[in-house]
Amino acid sequence: MQVGKILLPLLILGNAFMALSANDGRDAKFIPASDSRIAYMGRISTAKPDTVRFTYPGVNINAGFTGTSLKMGVKPGSGSYMIEIDDELPYRLNIGPNDSIVTLAESLPEGNHKVRATYVLEGYALKPEFHGFYVDKGADLSAKPVLPKRKIEFIGNSITCGYGVEADKPTDRFTYD
């Protein structure tokens, strides 16, 4: 009888742990940030192997992919992105202190899809990194997206990138939250 009182909670905890860890990218195919089918726009650094680093808002990561879901490997606690899947309305994705693999899309119909992840914070203190994408087993990235030939570069400071645009009042101080 005592064994049952101990085993049941252990089984419940074990199942809970397995459910939590099931979404960590282990059942997916990893494609590193250095893959030539990923297109970047903005100032990036590729000095660290298989990693793309950046600090400026507006840097975006573009790719086409097949399958029904997509995850992204990032540096934990590195800020926020606006995510666009298949030209649908973008949504904001905040990278928490424990997030290293984040879900961008799931339950998509089978077929070809595209993603754009745009960094939306000043990343100087956060030092964001992109490590790569996770696609479904049997899925892959498509050909590298064609970026616009003409671009406009904005050179400025915090005001240029929208410092305080999400503040409730003019006296609010900047935070990464």
Predicted regions and their residues:
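Bacterial Sec-dependent N-terminal signal peptides
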Residues: 1-27
